[in-house]
Design a protein with these regions (language model features):
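Phosphate-group recognition and catalysis centered on beta-loop-alpha active-site segments
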Residues: 1-435
């Protein structure tokens, strides 16, 4: 956090310094940078550069978000870049060095050619806009209530979700329950009070070490409302009643969730941890069948024993994680693993495509324009209120706007040139007429 604050301060300082420099150039004042500013500017550039490189190395898995974000912002970034070029051009060509002028022309050419490479799914006619993707609550509504608790799933119902997404493990006495963290020492410590209730088991890594009675006795909500662990910084927006309800949540069983889903005609999609255990899949299937939920509302995702599940529980809707391995018409992939063109291709082939990890409006907008069937999200309370994507721009209108900007860029220097060379001539001509 400290590094981010330092980076923000240095970035603001560099931007302000650049603005002051532009003002001085515009006023015709000489640029005379104090030695202290030179040192700070050099330090800021080096610090920010190393920071960006470091973040890129640490979060390599997030690099796919860059081209996606450009699809959402490229048309507007290009407009802004053209505006900046228009403002900077008189300063660049006013006695600039040859190399600087050449570099400026090269950058200008790249910016003006950008529209040839901009491919955004939201550059479409309004009447071509696909149906809004359905919402699947990732562990319920984890921004509004503790994840994987009954309160969380009840909150997601208010968002209009069509499915609950959850994670299933088995207790020592073979009761399926809901919990994401798994297979590492202290897997219950993040979301329960295991350290207080069973300190001798606090570092256990296996759900089979706990009976269902022990799991039910754990508090699964108090961690959520504490300032130190508030995962989405959203607790301050909750009512006192919601905070109190969250504080008293417990670990639910799979059967409880299935009964809630059956009551509200909502589907259920889930992962199983750890699916390699003997008979674990069978125990979960038995619980599902015992609940009486409509089998078509069970969106089966785990690849383990899939063929066996198809035999003992026909009627489940099977989702696949890989477009190359899928055998049916249902696909469940992360937002970074399928490009927008592929989504459209699958949808045109009547394949249902669910995209998971979608928590931001801009990403949801892109997927909406691309035709995604549904998204799995933490922020269903935000996405439910969207009546249309953040922006939709008809290609013809974008072309007109682009041509207008180009005209403005090229005509403004011409006007300045005419004023420079013609005004003295006109004034001289008028003076002669008067004499």
């Amino acid at each position: 956090m400290v590094l981010f604050i330092i980076s923000a301060v240095l970035t603001s300082y560099c931007v302000l310094l650049l603005l002051f420099a532009l003002f001085q150039v515009a006023l015709g004042e000489p640029l005379d940078l104090h030695w202290l500013h030179k040192i700070l500017l050099f330090f800021g550039v080096v610090f920010i550069t190393f920071g960006v490189v470091g973040i890129g190395l640490i979060w390599k898995q997030e690099w796919p978000i860059v081209p996606l974000s450009l699809q959402a912002t490229a048309p507007f970034l290009q407009f802004g870049a053209v505006g900046a070029l228009t403002l900077l051009s008189p300063f660049i060509f006013r006695g600039s060095k040859f190399l600087i002028a050449v570099a400026f022309i090269a950058v200008s050419a790249a910016i003006f050619l950008c529209p040839l490479y901009i491919q955004s799914p939201c550059l479409i006619e309004v009447h071509e806009l696909p149906e809004k993707p359905k919402l699947i609550g990732h562990r319920g509504a984890p921004m509004l209530a503790p994840e994987n608790t009954m309160m969380s799933f009840e909150k997601s119902i208010a968002c209009g979700v069509t499915a609950f997404e959850t994670d299933i493990q088995l207790s020592k006495d073979r009761i399926p329950f809901l919990m994401h963290d798994n297979n590492f020492p202290g897997f219950l410590r993040r979301t329960t009070d295991i350290k207080d209730k069973f300190p001798e088991k606090a570092n256990s890594r296996d759900s089979a070490n706990f009976t269902w009675e022990e799991l039910q006795s754990l508090n699964a909500g108090d961690w959520f409302v504490k300032v130190r662990t508030d995962p989405f910084h959203s607790v301050s927006y909750l009512s006192e009643d919601d905070i109190e309800a969250a504080r008293n949540q417990t670990i639910p069983s799979l059967l409880q969730l299935l009964n809630l889903a059956k009551e509200h005609n909502i589907s259920v999609i889930f992962d199983i941890y750890s699916p390699e255990k003997e008979n674990e899949t069978d125990d979960i299937v038995k619980t599902i069948l015992h609940s009486g939920i409509d089998r078509s509302r069970v969106l089966w995702l785990p690849p383990t024993k899939r063929e066996h599940v198809k035999k003992i529980a026909p009627g489940f809707t099977h989702f696949y994680k890989d477009s190359e391995e899928k055998e049916g018409n249902y696909l469940n992939v992360k937002y970074s693993e399928l490009n927008m063109a592929d989504i459209r291709k699958h949808r045109s082939s009547n394949v249902t495509v669910n995209i998971w990890g979608v928590n931001e409006r801009w990403l949801f907008s892109l997927l909406w324009c691309s035709g995604a069937s549904s998204v799995t999200t933490n922020s269903c309370h935000i996405l439910k209120d969207m009546d249309r994507p953040d922006w939709v721009l008809v290609s013809n209108k974008y072309s007109c706007m682009y041509i207008s900007l180009c005209f403005t860029f090229f005509i403004s220097p011409s006007i300045r040139t005419l004023k420079t060379f013609l005004l003295p001539f006109i004034n001289n001509f008028l003076t002669k007429l008067q004499t």
